[in-house]
Amino acid sequence: MFFACGHNGQRTTSEDGIHWSSPVFGKEGEVYRTAAAGPGEIVCIGRFGGQNITAASKDGATWKLGGNDAKYKDYIQGVTYGNGTFLALGGDPGSVGVGDPFVMLSSDGESWSSIVKTSGKFILRRAVWGNGMWVGVGDRGRRAASRDGKVWEDAPKVKAIDTLVDIAFGNDIFVGVGLHGLRMTSRDGITWENRQTGIEGEHLNSILWADHRFVAVGLGGTWTSSDGVTWDRKENQNAPLTAAYARGSFIGAHWRGRLLHSTDAIQWKEVFKSEQHFEAVAAV
């Protein structure tokens, strides 16, 4: 199943990434900003005023809504799934100098733990499970690893210029991507190598492990690699701001309210349009 969520509580699903259901809406002002999927469960997370809001569904039709008091500072920034667990990452996006990072965990996407404050100065925004660990990337170049999602070890001596905006795992390696075509690899989330950059201004917004290769999608170019070291770049058309992959299909979202589909992550076609913008897409 493919799904997308966004502004005014908007949620929609698709079996093939091409034909989408009529959106379900929430309250005006609700914004779902991140999404993840596990076996038999899809989850959207966002904010409404001073609240974190969650929406979980097994079929895309019936949703269980929830949330917690963010106190206008403990906002969830990202969510991912791995090892039978949904992991939500957050912190204070308005802080100066320290992000006050935290995590929340759930086995089903519906019932969540209380906020668990974690070490580190800056927020982790994206994470992936692989090799028996979580590896997360976040603000000001932060990169960290955790066995349980609660206790994190940071990579040393990181630089803000090397901020990674997304991360994927495949072929026994973690690969992160970022601004100006930045790509880096790691075996353990602590030691990073093979730093490469691309074209100035061509930011890589998403990286996916798709059909035995890494696929990094940016506005202008799509990069592919089997090992995270040797890459091939092709100019893309109509590329999305965020992307997901499953069963031979790539989906993505772009301003405003556009859902896109592709079979190669290079040629993208608009397949759905809404008056409300989609912030996140995911697939299972």
Q: What are the functions of these language-model segments?
A:
Residues 1-284:
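Residue-level hotspots at or immediately adjacent to binding/recognition sites across diverse folds
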